[in-house]
Each structure stands twice: as C-alpha cells, then as structure tokens.
Amino acid sequence: MSKKFRSNVMLLITAIIWGSAFVAQKAGTVLEPFTYNGLRMLIGGIALIPVILIFSAKNKDDEQKSMEDKQTEKKTVLIGGIACGLILALASSLQQFGLYFETDAGKAGFITILYIVFVPVLGLFIGKKVRPIIWLCVLIGAVGFYFLTMAGSDAGFGLTTGDLFVLICAIAFACHILVIDHFSPKCDGVKMSCVQFLVAGIVCLVLMAIFENPSVTAIIDCWLPILYCGVFSSGVGYTLQVVAQKYAEPTAASLILSLESVFAVIAGVLFAGESMTGFEIFGCVIIFAAVILAQLPTKEERLK
C-alpha cells in the first residue's frame, strides 16, 4: 500500500467522521458559537495528550535525533500549531456565526465547500502547481455540491450577512489546508494537531468570556455532542488530516475532505430521520465521480 493511498484513506475516514458529527453539531446548536467551538477544540487537544505520550514512549527515532534536530522540530510544532490553531479558530467561528445570522443550511454548505476552489487558487500564489485534471475535478465537485445542497431550494442565492461570514470561512479553511501542507511534512503531525486545538480552544474561550454569556445548564445538557465532536471530529478527524497531508496533494486532499457533506447527508438519513431527494442523490454521485477522477494516477505515475 503506497503512502499516497494510505493518506487518501485517512482523509476519507476524516470526511466520514466530520460528516457523521453533523448530527451531533445540530444537537449542540443551543450553545453560542465561541462557547461551542472553545469547548470542543479544548477537549480535542486534551484527548491527544495521552496519544502523544504513548507514541513518544514507543518511538525509537527520537532517540537517534540530535539535540539540534529535536529543537528544530519542537519549534516547527509550536509555530505550525499556533498558525493552524489561529486559522482554525477563525474558520470555525465564522462558520458558526454564518449559521447564527440565519444563512440557509444548504446555502451555507455550498458556500463553505468553495474551499475546494480556493485551495488551488491560493496555492498558485505560493508556487503550488496544480494538474489540469484537478481543475476539472474542482468544477465537477462544485456542480455536485450544488445539486446536493441547493438544487430545488426556494431560498435563491441572495448574499446575506451570514453568507459573507461563511464565504470568508471557506477562504480561511482553504488557508488552513495550505498551512497544514506546509508544516506537516516537517514535524510530528499529532503533536502539531494537539497544539492547534489547544490554541483554537483557548482563543475561542477568551472570546467567549468577552462576548458571550454561556449557560452552565446548556453546556451540561449538550455534554454528549460536545464530547463527541471534541474527541472524534476535532481530536481524531483533524489529526488524521494533518498526518495524511504529509503525502497528499493539497487540492486532491480538499476534494476528498469535501465528501464531508455527502456523509453528513447520509448520517442525517440514518440517525436523524432525514430523507434524500433525487437532486441530493445525483449530487452525491457527481461528487464521488470527481474525487475518484482526482485520484487516478498520471501517465508518469503509471509508468513507474
């Protein structure tokens, strides 16, 4: 099994985890955005600490590294974790506020997923090369998400304040993918993920203390969705993303991660009693086709 294939499988698992967490997130919407994000991110970071300790005890490679290499990696973990954490806090909060300002859920999903377009566009500014087939996959994926989230809706496409929040959120998530792509090959992905969650959690909790008035009763009532999203969606999901992106092409990675919405629809059908329309099923098929097309080997790769 190649490293690229393993990375793609991990990204697919991440998309499944994030999609299934949609049901839990709906159950936790009674909490204000900074409160919800702060608690789930902090739990995600704390959940990774024992994982880091276990892997560190078993990892023999660290013993062979020089003191200078260890210091360099620690610095990279810290800088990368802080950078990713700040962007993650921004992106997740913008998304929550977009929904708070009553952006239609389907429209919000479509706008957010525009990060699959922003990744290659922003990547060009930092010297990233994108295979032509990826641009076609981005277009096919965008069409698929339209059918999945918006086709047949009476809401139209008028841009509201909430829509603007979600649009900026999509740009922030694209930046998050590119920043991870920059730092993850240079350090321990699990450690960097832990730092990013602790940073994002602290930032959101500070903003919560300034701008929100959280109810202890509401937090207690939502302990299960907070715990699920903190441990699985944040701790496991984002860590798999960080580790997988060591060997995955960032634009292809964003396409696989965009399957989150497909699995969110499936989870809604299985666990929340929701139903899928013909348009939604058609959108799922198109998106899967785009992702498969993006993973087909190039002529050079087939010859190797």
Each language-model region and where it sits:
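Glycine-/small-residue-enriched transmembrane alpha-helix faces in small-molecule transporters
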Residues: 1-38, 86, 90, 94, ...
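Helix-helix packing/entry segments at the starts of transmembrane helices
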Residues: 15, 39, 108-114, 180-201, ...
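Juxtamembrane helix-loop-helix junctions in multi-pass membrane proteins
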Residues: 16-46, 64-68, 103-107, 175-199
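Specific transmembrane alpha-helical segments of multi-pass solute transporters/efflux pumps
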Residues: 21, 53-111, 147, 230-248
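C-terminal-most transmembrane helix of multi-pass membrane proteins
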Residues: 41, 53, 57, 222-224, ...
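Transmembrane alpha-helical segments that form core, pore/gating elements
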Residues: 45-48, 118-125, 138, 154-211, ...
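C-terminal transmembrane-helix exit sites in multi-pass transporters
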Residues: 47, 51-52, 115-139, 262-282
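Hydrophobic transmembrane alpha-helices of multi-pass small-molecule transport proteins
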Residues: 48, 130-151, 169, 173, ...
